[in-house]
From Swiss-Prot:
Pathway: Steroid hormone biosynthesis; Lipid metabolism; fatty acid metabolism; Cofactor metabolism; retinol metabolism. Belongs to the cytochrome P450 family. This is Cytochrome P450 1A1. GO terms for molecular function: estrogen 16-alpha-hydroxylase activity; estrogen 2-hydroxylase activity; heme binding; Hsp70 protein binding; Hsp90 protein binding; hydroperoxy icosatetraenoate dehydratase activity; iron ion binding; monooxygenase activity. Its main location: endoplasmic reticulum. Glycans are attached at S71. Induction: By polychlorinated biphenyl (PCB) in liver and kidney.
Length: 524
C-alpha cells in the first residue's frame, strides 16, 4: 500500500516551465478581463454564469421574478451576464432612487441594443443611446408640445383641459359600444374596445383626429402593441446573442415589419399636417412641432432644430408614451374590479356621494375621490405591469452603494421588486386599496410615492402625469354609469405575460349592467 504513495511521475524542467508559463498567462488574462477597481470599491456580487450563455437560463420567462429572487440573495446591487454582456441589476427603492435621481447624470444613458435600433430607425428619443444636451432639449420640446394639447385649457371648450374633453367623448363612445355588444352578444372582451378609445385620445392630441372602433388601419397597429412590447423588453436574447439576428427568425421579421408600419402610419399623418398647416393656427402637437421646425432663427436653440424626419420620430414617441401604458392600466383595472366586486361597489358608492349622476366626473373631482385613487395605486402596485424601466446605461465610471460601476454598463431597474418588497408593503401579494388610505380617509402621500411604474429621474416617462389623469377619468366615467362583472364561475386568468408592459390573457366573458342604484345626485 505504502509503495503506491511513493510512485512519482517524472517531470522535466522544460515541462514544468511550460506549465508555469501557461498558468501565469491564464492568471494574467483573468486579471486583465476583470476591471481595475478604485481603492475602497468592490465589484457587484452575482451568480455564476455558464460559458457563452451567462445567466440567461436563470432568467426564464419571467425575468422580473427571477431577478427579484436573486436580489434576496445578493442584495439590491447585483451583476449577471446575458451571453458575454455584464448587466447591472438594481432593486430596492432607496438604491434605485439613489441611482436614477441623486446620481441621475451617471445612470441616464441607454444601452446600444439591437432591438432599440429598429425603433424609428434608431432615432427614438425614448430608445436612442443619445443622452446629451441636444437629446435633453428635444425631450423638453416634446414634453412641452404634449402638455400644450393635454393638460392646458381649451378656450373653446367647457372642459378644464384638452385631455378632459377628449377622454369624456371617448368614454361615452366606449360605453355605447359595450352596451351594444351586451345587447347583441351578451358578453365582450373589453381590451378590444379600450385600445381604440385610448388610441383616439392620443390621436386627438397629436393629429386632431379620431377613428371609428372598426377602422382597420388603426386596429391593425394598436392591436399589435403586445408584440412591440415583447421586442423591446428587458433581457431580449436578440440584444445579447448577435448570432440570433442572422438565423431564420419569424419573430424578428415581424418586429421589423411592425416598426416600419408604425413609422409609415406616423409619416403619413405628419405629411397630411404639412399640407394643411397654417402658421398661427396651431391645432395639435404635430402642428406645434412643425412650427418649431420652420422656425429657422439662429439662436441659442439652433442645436435642437427638428428636421421633418425628426418630427415623425417625436410624434411616434409621444404616441407610444400616451397609448400602451394607459390601455394596459385600464385593462388590468377592469380585471381587478370583476375579481374584487366589493372594491367596485366602494368606488361606486364614493362616486355617487361626491358626484351623483347629474354630471360626468371631471379631473377636478380627483382629490375628492380618495378610494378611487387608492384603487388605481393598488392596481399599479399589484399588477406592476411595467416590471422594468427601459434599460439604462452608465454615462461614466461611477459607484453605487460601495460598488464600482464602469462607464457603458447596461442597467436593469426592477420596478416589480419595489412594488412587491415585503419590507415596504408587509403583505404585497394581497390586493388591498385601503393600504393607501390614512385613518381620516385621505391618500397616504408618502406611501403612494413608493409605487414605481413610470421610472424615475432623467429618463422618467414624459407621459406620466397625463397617463395618471387619463386612467382616473376613464374609470370614473365608466364606473359612474355601469357595473362590470363576469358570469358566476368564470375563471379569470390574472397571470401576466412578460413584456415591456405585461398584459393579461384576454377575457371574452365581461358583462356590463347599467347602474340604477345611487341615482340621487348631490349639487354639481
Amino acid at each position: 500500500m505504502m509503495s503506491m504513495f511513493r510512485l512519482s511521475i517524472p517531470i522535466s524542467a522544460s515541462e514544468l516551465l511550460l506549465a508555469s508559463t501557461v498558468f501565469c498567462l491564464v492568471l494574467w488574462v483573468v486579471k486583465a478581463w476583470q476591471p481595475r477597481l478604485p481603492k475602497g470599491l468592490k465589484s457587484p456580487p452575482g451568480p455564476w454564469g455558464w460559458p457563452v450563455l451567462g445567466n440567461v437560463l436563470t432568467l426564464g420567462k419571467s425575468p422580473h421574478l427571477a431577478l427579484s429572487r436573486l436580489s434576496q440573495r445578493y442584495g439590491d446591487v447585483l451583476q449577471i451576464r446575458i451571453g458575454s454582456t455584464p448587466v447591472l441589476v438594481l432593486s430596492g427603492l432607496d438604491t434605485i432612487r439613489q441611482a436614477l435621481v441623486r446620481q441621475g447624470d451617471d445612470f441616464k444613458g441607454r444601452p446600444d441594443l439591437y432591438s432599440f435600433s429598429l425603433v424609428t430607425d434608431g432615432q427614438s428619443l425614448t430608445f436612442s443611446p443619445d443622452s446629451g444636451p441636444v437629446w435633453a432639449a428635444r425631450r423638453r420640446l416634446a414634453q412641452n408640445a404634449l402638455k400644450s394639447f393635454s393638460i392646458a385649457s381649451d378656450p373653446a371648450s367647457s372642459c378644464s383641459c384638452y385631455l378632459e374633453e377628449h377622454v369624456s367623448k371617448e368614454a361615452e363612445v366606449l360605453l355605447s359600444r359595450l352596451q351594444e355588444q351586451m345587447a347583441e352578444v351578451g358578453r365582450f372582451d373589453p381590451y378590444r374596445y379600450i385600445v381604440v378609445s385610448v388610441a383616439n385620445v392620443i390621436c386627438a392630441m397629436c393629429f386632431s383626429k379620431r377613428y371609428d372602433h372598426d377602422d382597420q388601419e388603426l386596429l391593425s397597429l394598436v392591436n399589435l402593441s403586445n408584440e412591440f412590447g415583447e421586442g423591446v423588453a428587458s433581457a431580449n436574447p436578440l440584444d445579447f446573442f448577435p448570432i440570433l439576428r442572422y438565423l431564420p427568425n419569424p419573430a424578428l421579421d415581424f418586429f421589423k415589419d411592425l416598426n416600419k408600419r408604425f413609422y409609415s402610419f406616423m409619416q403619413k399623418m405628419v405629411k397630411e399636417h404639412y399640407k394643411t398647416f397654417e402658421k398661427g393656427q396651431i391645432r395639435d402637437v404635430t402642428d406645434s412641432l412643425i412650427e418649431h421646425c420652420q422656425d429657422k432663427r439662429l439662436d441659442e436653440n439652433a442645436n435642437i432644430q427638428l428636421s421633418d424626419e425628426k418630427i415623425v420620430n417625436v410624434v411616434l414617441d409621444l404616441f407610444g408614451a400616451g397609448f400602451d401604458t394607459v390601455t394596459t392600466a385600464i385593462s388590468w383595472s377592469l380585471l381587478y374590479l370583476v375579481t374584487n366586486p366589493n372594491v367596485q361597489k366602494k368606488i361606486q358608492k364614493e362616486l355617487d356621494t361626491v358626484i351623483g349622476r347629474a354630471r360626468q366626473p371631471r379631473l377636478s373631482d380627483r382629490p375628492q375621490l380618495p378610494y378611487m385613487e387608492a384603487f388605481i395605486l393598488e392596481t399599479f402596485r399589484h399588477a406592476s405591469f411595467v416590471p422594468f424601466t427601459i434599460p439604462h446605461s452608465t454615462t461614466r465610471d461611477t459607484s453605487l452603494s460601495g460598488f464600482y460601476i464602469p462607464k457603458g454598463r447596461c442597467v436593469f431597474v426592477n420596478q416589480w421588486q419595489i412594488n412587491h418588497d415585503q419590507k415596504l408593503w408587509g403583505n404585497p401579494s394581497e390586493f388591498q386599496p385601503e393600504r393607501f388610505l390614512t385613518l381620516d380617509g385621505t391618500i397616504n402621500k408618502a406611501l403612494s410615492e413608493k409605487v414605481i411604474l413610470f421610472g424615475l429621474g432623467k429618463r422618467k416617462c414624459i407621459g406620466e402625469t397625463i397617463a395618471r389623469l387619463e386612467v382616473f377619468l376613464f374609470l370614473a366615467i365608466l364606473l359612474q354609469q355601469v357595473e362590470f362583472s363576469v358570469p358566476e364561475g368564470t375563471k379569470v386568468d390574472m397571470t401576466p405575460i412578460y413584456g415591456l408592459t405585461m398584459k393579461h390573457a384576454r377575457c371574452e366573458h365581461f358583462q356590463v349592467r347599467v347602474r340604477t342604484e345611487g341615482a340621487e345626485s348631490p349639487a354639481a
